[in-house]
Swiss-Prot record:
Pfam families: MutH. This is DNA mismatch repair protein MutH. It is found in: Cytoplasm. GO terms for molecular function: DNA binding; endonuclease activity. The lineage of its organism: Bacteria, Pseudomonadati, Pseudomonadota, Gammaproteobacteria, Alteromonadales. It comes from the Bacteria. Belongs to the MutH family. InterPro entries: DNA_mismatch_repair_MutH, DNA_rep_MutH/RE_typeII_Sau3AI, DNA_rep_MutH/T2_RE_sf, Restrct_endonuc-II-like. Keywords: Cytoplasm, DNA damage, DNA repair, Endonuclease, Hydrolase, Nuclease. Sequence-specific endonuclease that cleaves unmethylated GATC sequences. It is involved in DNA mismatch repair. GO terms for cellular component: cytoplasm. The gene is mutH. GO terms for biological process: DNA modification; mismatch repair. It comes from Shewanella sp. (strain ANA-3).
Length: 223
């Protein structure tokens, strides 16, 4: 199957996303000639990759927005029957070294969350993967209050990383943004700042949006 040409503009992207609303993942996968996994235990990113492919996203795993030419990040969000998010939303890998002078405005979190196309997808486990339907997409830009909350959490987390306290950061830190170990394999290691300012090895960390925050975003649109 030929890769889909990236959308030329925002209205084309939204048109593609709206055309998926109400369609099952099996229908999209069949159209792309892709097998549907029995479950997502070993294919956690499968839904997101399928939606990326269908919409013509270009970034892949690169540290930039999925539709860089449009300034849009794509996020699929698994929801329950009441439209509530079922899990936190991964944003990006957290930098653990060389962070002196890094500001919120220059951070990858800020860059990725400037404009997000949220694509809700049914995610309850009793629904077979292929039968799960895609919901109505939402194009979101953080308002001043949301920006403030995100920036505040990011700055507090980064300050603790700079002080060598990354191990003391738990998923409970942050009102809307949290830091968690990223690697599926707990043996994966990367460098981070130690409390004495030297470098030490630790598990890679990622930034995630808490479900209370994404639930608030969905609720603003769907009520």
């Amino acid at each position: 199957m030929k890769p889909i040409i990236p959308p030329q503009n925002l209205s084309e992207l939204l048109e593609r996303a709206n055309m998926m609303a109400g369609i099952s993942l099996a229908q999209i996968a069949a159209h792309r000639g892709i097998a549907v996994p029995k479950d997502l235990k070993r294919d956690k990113g499968w839904v997101g990759q399928l939606i990326e492919m269908e919409l013509g996203a270009t970034a892949g795993s690169k540290p930039e927005q999925d539709f860089l030419h449009l300034g849009v990040e794509l996020k699929t969000i698994p929801i329950d029957s009441k439209g509530k998010p079922l899990e936190t939303t991964y944003v990006c890998v957290a930098p653990l070294t060389n962070i002196e002078g890094l500001t919120w405005q220059d951070s990858l979190v800020c860059h990725k969350l400037q404009r997000v196309l949220w694509v809700p997808v049914e995610g309850e486990r009793h629904i077979p993967v292929g039968d799960r339907r895609v919901g109505t997409p939402i194009l979101w830009e953080p308002d001043l209050q949301e920006q403030r909350l995100l920036q505040q959490d990011w700055e507090e987390i980064m300050e603790l990383i700079a002080l060598g306290k990354v191990e003391k950061l738990t998923a409970r830190h942050g009102e809307v943004l949290q830091l968690r170990p990223k690697a599926a394999n707990s043996k994966a290691l990367t460098q981070s700042i130690a409390e004495d300012g030297s470098l030490k090895m630790t598990n890679p960390r990622g930034f995630y949006l808490k479900t209370a925050f994404t639930a608030m975003l969905l609720n603003k649109v769907f009520g």
